[in-house]
């Protein structure tokens, strides 16, 4: 049976992280289910690589309307291996920490927590205020995995893509997919 991965893209800065994850997941035997918050397409106009939003959506096998709370991915009976919210806005963190499921991104994420399945959140906000930090702590205690979009420098990144690939590579590690899109730490002598 093919793995199903749910990807949520919010309107936070960091759209290239979500797009790159979709591109790399296509290389694996994975069924990609995508839902995006209402403002994600607007952020893509400013941060994207020039491709249309329609082209971004075409990277997924199934696209779910964020307003459709009756979508298959809104139910615990939908067998998803994991969900990644990338990037994850501060607003989405707050809604999740408060248990508010007012769109399909938040509903699907809360379902992952209640079903005890992996939920990976990639917050991109900086600086972090106390409210964001407390929300991340609350979600971490509830079982979510936090992957802040804080790239490493030990791998000597030369391009923006190197930094994007580092974060996406770490997400892939947590999903259990091997990828060589970033250099791993090999220690010192």
Locate predicted features:
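A cross-family phosphate/adenosyl-ligand binding-site feature
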Residues: 2-120, 124-189
